[in-house]
């Protein structure tokens, strides 16, 4: 996953030139970047397990967005502790492997984590109020949240907004009306990330735009369009193995919270 993400960024930087892309991927600074990302991802996963945060975490395993600790499963104090701890860990490892100023790297990491957390919380809130906002309101809200979070993190505002819009537009074709496994949910997040990256490339033509758009689209998918974990657990429990009942309960739930899965329901 790390290599695919880096390859996508490199392809954008080289304007689609395959030979130049392969050349840039073999450079020492690119290798260092990949090694750093892998080291940070592994260390942060260990930190989550040590602190007990892994039991309450939502999301996937991409180090760019991380497994975010949403406040519907944790307190603001826990979220703040985790953001600060992750910033220290990622900046320390980044400085050790790639060099540079620790203070500068820490500021960058802290703002990046704050931006991602803000986006996840915003998408979660938008998902909870989908019935009030409607489709147009959700699209507008996601665009605003994506732009603000990108500004906080120092990313591309245009790319982030494009990614959020792309995730909403692609929603109907990506989802269906059944509760799927965690692996399926992860695949959906990666599809949204890919769609967002392409939208960012078209909108900005820059690597920064591709990264911001991909992150934005993935966060919209994880924390808004998919039913929340507690909701899917409750629906499965009520259905008690009855597939027809499961579909009816999901249909009712989606219409209640205005999740995108309702678009494909009969």
Regions found by a protein language model. Name each.
Residues 1-192, 202-206:
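Extended, hydrophobic alpha-helical membrane-active domains that insert into or remodel lipid bilayers
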Residues 94-99, 167-176, 185, 189-266:
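Long, low-complexity, intrinsically disordered regions
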